[in-house]
Amino acid sequence: TSKWWSLSNATFLQWTMADVFGLLKYHPVPCFFAVSLLFFMGVEYTLRMIPPSSPPFDIGFVATAYLHRVLVASPTLNTVLAGLNTLSVFVGMQTAYIIGTWVIEGRPRATVAALFMFTCRGILGYATQLPLPEGFLGSGADFPVGNVSFFLFYSGHVAGSVIASLDMKRMHRWELAFLFDTLNLLQVVRLLSTRGHYTIDLAIGVGAGMLFDSFAGKYMKKAAATTDDA
């Protein structure tokens, strides 16, 4: 027989001071985020909105203002960095590794994750097409090439690198994962410096890589269970 809930059964009425201090001691991360929630609620409701006639405020652009000026003054350097980025982080190492885990090692999880991620990126990128950031520095060595149209939200470069790095860590390829994470960080700095992405594109790219890697893992587990049942 079920019982009706009453306020006297509320969990918080059973808390003691030891429980409160234990929360701070054993769960500092949620406590930190609780304080952060209150802080950013204050920031959000006191900050003035950016008017439609003004460019978006981006803290990443502010932090990389000097590097942006350097690249504006040196188009050759911008092209060299774009070429290195394309070959090392995106087209070269990232794509080769993710496809290689499937066709060579027989582990399709990273490939499935990348397919999930890029499909979702295409849908979201088309659904909300953000304006090109002011001061964008295109390059013929970039991917997508030159100034052709591309979706800003979210960064497929960053998300793909995260997917590859997570697979490396699962396989205990720690040195390679560290190299990929380092290159991805440098890629983030470069994309901000060239105004190729907003900060939110890059941050969500990290989260998307982790999310779709998790989705791919669940898909592979379910697919394996279905095959075993058959």
Where are these regions (language model features)?
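Membrane-interface loop-to-helix entry segments
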Residues: 73-92, 145-170, 199, 203
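Hydrophobic alpha-helical transmembrane segments
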Residues: 30-34, 111, 177-181, 199, ...
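Membrane-interface loops
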Residues: 48-68, 99-189, 212, 216-230
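Helix-loop-helix junctions and helix-breaking kinks within/between transmembrane helices
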Residues: 190-202
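Generic alpha-helical transmembrane segments of integral inner-membrane proteins
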Residues: 37-41, 119, 123, 207, ...
